[in-house]
């Protein structure tokens, strides 16, 4: 998927929270992924949004959640 490479590059270059783009290519299930990530994060403090528009702003997530995000996208891509 188009958004995977920037995420992987960010994971290699930083241990801090990173910005995961959410765009038209995966907007069909991006909200579902966000809900899953929020639930698995344990608290809302580790997940913050730039603004109310999730599709245009993307998502700030920590390194572990970024790996999970990539795995979920990969699995969904295979299923779809």
From Swiss-Prot:
Name this protein carries in UniProt: Uncharacterized 8.5 kDa protein
Record organism: Vaccinia virus (strain Western Reserve) (VACV)
